[in-house]
Amino acid sequence: MSSHADSNPWTVPALAQAKRAGRKLVMLTAYDASFARTFDVNGVDLILVGDSLGMVMQGHDSTLAVTTADMVYHTAAVARALDRALLVADLSFQADATPERALDAATQLLQAGAEMVKIEGAGHKLEVIRYLVEREIPVCSHLGLTPQSVLRFGGYKVQGRGEAGEQLRRDAQAVVDAGASLVVLECVPTPIATQISAELSVPTIGIGAGPGCDGQVLVMHDMLGLDSGHRRPKFVKDFLAEGGSVAGAVRAYAQAVRDGSFPDAEHAYAA
C-alpha cells in the first residue's frame, strides 16, 4: 500500500492522495510545543489545535468560552514544533458567525502557523466555507456532534441516527461542494459514517464514528488516559497503558489507526 514518506511534510493535496491510496490518516490534538513535537516525530499526520483546550487546558465545562486570542496563542506554540504534521486550528465559538468575522479569525490563525481551519456545522456555514476557500484558506468541516452546539443538542449525544443520518449525508456533500478539503465526523453511528466516507471525494476523520472513516482523531488527554474532569466518552481508548510512555502511546495509537484495529466495535456507535 502506498504511504506518505515520513520525511515529507503533509500538505492539503496530500490528504486526498492518501484517501485514494487507502492510507489511514492519524490525527491528535495538541496545545503546546512539547507534546506537538513528540506527536510529530512519532507518526502523527495531522495536529489539531482544538477549542477543546477550553475543557482540557482551561477547565471549562464546554468549548464556548474559548476566544480567537486563545486559539492564536496555542496555534503559534504548536506550529513552532512541527516539521511534518499538517496543522489544523479551530475557529472558536461565533468566530465564524459571518464570512467577514471568519476571514479575520482564520487570517490570524494562518499567520500563527495553521495550514487549515476547522469550522463546525453546515447550513449557513456553507457560505463561510466558500468565502474562505475563495480566499485561499483551506477548510476542514466538522459535522455530527459539534461541541459548539452543545446547548442546542442538550448535551453531548450521538448524532445522525434514523432520518438524521440522511441529513448528515447531505450536509457532508454540501460542505465538500462548498470547498472543504477534510471532514471530521464526531459521534456518528458507524454505518452512516462509513457510507459518508465512501461517498465523499475528500478524507473523513472520525472521532466516535467507527473504523470506516479515512482517519481518526482523539483529544490527546483522552488518548493518554488523563482525567480531564469530564465523563469519558465511549470512543476513547487509553493508549498510554499499552505504550508505556507518551511516545510509545502515540506510536501505538498511530499503528492501531493505520492497521484498522482502532476503533473497534467497543469504541464506536451502532446504528
UniProtKB/Swiss-Prot annotation:
Pfam families: Pantoate_transf (PF02548)
Native organism: Xanthomonas oryzae pv. oryzae (strain KACC10331 / KXO85)
EC class of the enzyme, as a word: transferase
Family assignment from sequence similarity: Belongs to the PanB family.
Biological process terms in GO annotation: pantothenate biosynthetic process
Pathway assigned to this chain's UniProt record: Cofactor biosynthesis; (R)-pantothenate biosynthesis; (R)-pantoate from 3-methyl-2-oxobutanoate: step 1/2
The reaction(s) this protein catalyses: 3-methyl-2-oxobutanoate + (6R)-5,10-methylene-5,6,7,8-tetrahydrofolate + H2O = 2-dehydropantoate + (6S)-5,6,7,8-tetrahydrofolate
UniProt binding sites for Mg(2+): 51, 90, 120
Family matches, as SUPFAM superfamilies: Phosphoenolpyruvate/pyruvate domain (SSF51621)
CDD domains cross-referenced by the UniProt entry: KPHMT-like
Compartments (UniProt record): Cytoplasm
Described purpose of this protein according to its UniProt entry: Catalyzes the reversible reaction in which hydroxymethyl group from 5,10-methylenetetrahydrofolate is transferred onto alpha-ketoisovalerate to form ketopantoate.
One GO molecular-function entry: 3-methyl-2-oxobutanoate hydroxymethyltransferase activity
Principal location: cytoplasm
Subunit structure: Homodecamer; pentamer of dimers.
One GO cellular component, as annotated: cytoplasm
EC number(s) given by UniProt: 2.1.2.11
Textual note on the cofactor: Binds 1 Mg(2+) ion per subunit.
The keyword Metal-binding is assigned to this record: yes
Binding-site positions, 3-methyl-2-oxobutanoate: 51-52, 90, 118
Swiss-Prot/TrEMBL cofactor(s): Mg(2+)
Keyword presence, Magnesium: yes
Entry superkingdom: Bacteria
Protein name, entry field: 3-methyl-2-oxobutanoate hydroxymethyltransferase
Active site residues per record: 186 (proton acceptor)
Keyword annotations of the record: Cytoplasm, Magnesium, Metal-binding, Pantothenate biosynthesis, Transferase
